[in-house]
Structure formats: structure tokens, C-alpha cells
Amino acid sequence: MSEMAASSAISLLDIKLRRFGVGASNHELRLTKWFKGDQAGAPTRRFTCFADMLAPIRRSEKSEERRFDQKMSAHGAGIKTSSSAVPFASPKSRFLSKQEKFYPRCTPRLTGPQSRDTPPKRDTGIANEKDWGIDLLNENVNEAGTNEDGSSWFRESGHDLGDNGYRCRWSRMGGRSHDGSSEWTETWWEKSDWTGYKELGVEKSGKNSEGDSWWETWQEVLHQDEWSNLARIERSAQKQAKSGTENAGWYEKWWEKYDAKGWTEKGAHKYGRLNEQSWWEKWGEHYDGRGSVLKWTDKWAETELGTKWGDKWEEKFFSGIGSRQGETWHVSPNSDRWSRTWGEEHFGNGKVHKYGKSTTGESWDIVVDEETYYEAEPHYGWADVVGDSTQLLSIQPRERPPGVYPNLEFGPSPPPEPDLPPDQPQ
């Protein structure tokens, strides 16, 4: 009964948090603070165009399809509009609309970026680069504007240079509603240097009129591993959101690492809270590329009244031989603890030793005939990530002058990144 209660509580909490994760109104265009720009000599252009002064922007069929591509829009894809002028006069010109006739009254013709005032969704893992629609401009841009409803927007782009051939190309955009209750910003970038390092990334943040706030970042990196000298691709994502109407919020950190010999590491850390309930989850997978695999999961939750419950397991295998073990546990508000532990030993000959016990007196220790099944290779590996990283791999570094070579000295390992909110003692 304790297990069922614990499982039901976790499911209910998860459903509530999922509901919050996508709870945000999607108003037309709310934009962020005016942006002065940090590029010397790059003036900021601002102006207001009203509906009866704007001509429809002509687009090719491909551009039109992209504008209404729901998948691209959901992940923050940029909208490309044709920069070509109105076509030369033709017999159809006499049918131009009134708006098109008044087109010269509003120049230059700028349109603000599409609003992205929606929090990220929970448990969506690491998106592929194509889902972001990252489109960096080649020229420096610094522009801003005001919409008919009073909302404002900005958009800018540029590049930074550094030692060892370092170059970072970036684009930044954002917007704010007329009263400041809703705002958002989004930054895209690509980095490279002469060592072969390449990086593609996105960072976005915002808030809406309900007081919900969020932050999200995504990165994809190609580099040479300092120990194996093999090419490695790493992808990561961090997401968090907080409710403006109740004591609720969540955080997720996801990562994936791959190398050309099949070595793979994947994992996630998650945390959530809904009023008096909190929950945590961690899991990881490690494949050495030679048949050895390690997988583990640890989940737990608690209430402010003192009830705690959780479940964890781990498996290790190589060449058909390995083990599995786990524990399910529950602690009541008066500190009464119940737990059940279990384990399996797989000998690789069709025999499996199963054992376990619980605090209520259960116990078992048997050997059974049973086939061993486990995943010795990741379902998504090096070949897959290379195929999904075409934009990363196509980043062009700065041209290296003759006789100049990159500095390949690897410095000390960076300190580990801060983890989730402190784990609760069990």
C-alpha cells in the first residue's frame, strides 16, 4: 500500500507540473527593453509603422512555407522575409491594393521578430539543431521598432574575435509589451577557432503577464578530446521555469557526449516543486564503445509534512555478464521507514541469481533459467549525432595566415559545474 501511495503521489505531482510547464498565454507580439547596442558606430534605427501605411511583404513560396511552419515556430525559428522590392510594373499593376499604393510612406520597411513569450516544455530532452532554426546574419545589424499595439522590439547581430583564431558570430533579438508585463530575449551564436573547436548555441529567457518566468540554453560542440585525440560531439540543454501565481517551478539539465569510437555518455538531472511537494530525478548511461554499459536512475520526492519516497536502480553489463540492483523506499512523517531491496546476477549461461528483502520481513534468494537482455549500444550514437549536426560541422573558422599554428596546449580541467539544488538526505 505504501508503494502504491508513493507512486500515485509522484504521478499526480508530475501531471500538475507538466500542466504548469506549458501554461503561458501567447499574445501577439510582446517585446523587451530598448537595446542601445554595444557596437561602436552602429546606430540604432527606431520608427513606428501603422497598419494603413504598410504594404504586404512579398515572399517566395519557400519563405511563405517557412513562416507558417508550426514546428519551426514552436522552437523559435527566425522568419526570413524577401528583401526584394515590388516587381516591375505589369498589366496587373492597376490592381494593387490601397496599402501597396501607400507603401512609400513607410521606409525603411522593417518587421520585428516573432514573439517567443512561451516557457520551455518539460521532459523534452535535447533538441536537434534543425528544431532551433538558427540563422545568423552575415552583416552587423542594430535595429529596433514599435508596433501598432505599443509593444517594442529589437534585433542586432555582430561578431567577436580573439586569440588562436577565435571568432564568435551572434544574433540577439527580443521584445516587450507596452506595459512591460511580458518580455523575452533570445540569442544565437556560433564559435570556432584554429584548433578545430566549433560551437552552436542558443539562450532564451522571458516572462509573461501572469508572472511566469523562464530561462533556457542549448549548446552543441565539436572538439578534439585531449586524452584520446578523437573527435567528440557534445550536446547539452538547461531549462527552468517558475510560476507567477503559485509556489511552483522546475529545472532540468540534460547532456549527451559522443566520440568517433562509439564511446557515449548521456544523463539528466531534474528538479520540480508544486506548493508543498518537491521531487528530484537523476539518471545516466555510459557506453565504452567496446560492449560495456552502465545505466542508473534515482528518483525521490517529499512533502513539507515530512513524507518521503523514492526508487533507484542500477545495471552493469559486459559480454552478457552483469548485474542489476535497486531499492524502493518510503519514510512517513514520524520517521518510520519502509524499504525493499532487490538484485540480479547474470552469469551469461542462461542462469540468473535473484535475491532481495524488505523491512517487513520479505526475502528471496533463488536461481532461475532466464535469458539476459540489455542494450550494449546506445539507440542514438555517433553516426546519428553526426547526421543531425550538419550546421555545427559546416561552421567555417577564420582563415589562418601562413606559418601561424594554433596553440594546442590544454589547460587544467575546469571546475565542475554547480549541480541541482542540494539533495535531500535519505
Curated annotation (Swiss-Prot):
Please give an example of a GO cellular component term from this record: starch grain
For bias kind Basic and acidic residues, which ranges apply? 118-127
- Phenotypic effect of disruption: Reduced rosette size, wide stem angles and delayed flowering. Rapidly degraded leaves starch in a nonlinear fashion during the night, so that reserves are exhausted 2 hours prior to dawn; this phenotype is probably due to an altered starch granule matrix organization. Reduced starch content in nonphotosynthetic parts (e.g. cells immediately adjacent to veins, columella cells of root caps, stems, flowers and siliques).
The answer to whether UniProt assigns keyword Chloroplast to this entry is yes
- What InterPro entries does the entry give? Alpha-glucan_binding_chloro
Gene Ontology molecular function: any one: starch binding
> What is any one GO biological process for this UniProt entry?
seed development
Which positions form the organelle transit peptide?
A: 1-58
Q: Which residues form a coiled coil?
A: none
Q: List all membrane-crossing ranges.
A: none
Q: Give UniProt keywords alphabetically.
A: Chloroplast, Plastid, Transit peptide
Record localization: Plastid, Chloroplast stroma; Plastid stroma
Pro residues compositional bias: what residue ranges?
A: 412-426
Cite the residue spans of the region called Disordered. Answer: 106-127, 396-426
Member of which family? Belongs to the ESV1 family.
Checking PANTHER family in the record gives:
INACTIVE PURPLE ACID PHOSPHATASE-LIKE PROTEIN, PROTEIN EARLY STARVATION 1, CHLOROPLASTIC
Relate the protein's function as given in its record. Binds preferentially to highly ordered alpha-glucans, such as starch and crystalline maltodextrins. Involved in the organization of the starch granule matrix, thus influencing starch turnover by modulating the accessibility of starch polymers to modifying and degrading enzymes involved in phosphorylation, hydrolyzes and synthesis, including starch synthases (SSI and SSIII), starch phosphorylases (PHS1), isoamylase, beta-amylase, glucan water dikinase (GWD) and phosphoglucan water dikinase (PWD). Prevents GWD- and PWD-mediated starch phosphorylation, and subsequent degradation.
| Protein name from the UniProt record | Protein EARLY STARVATION 1, chloroplastic
Q: Which organism is it from?
A: Arabidopsis thaliana (Mouse-ear cress)
Gene of this entry: ESV1
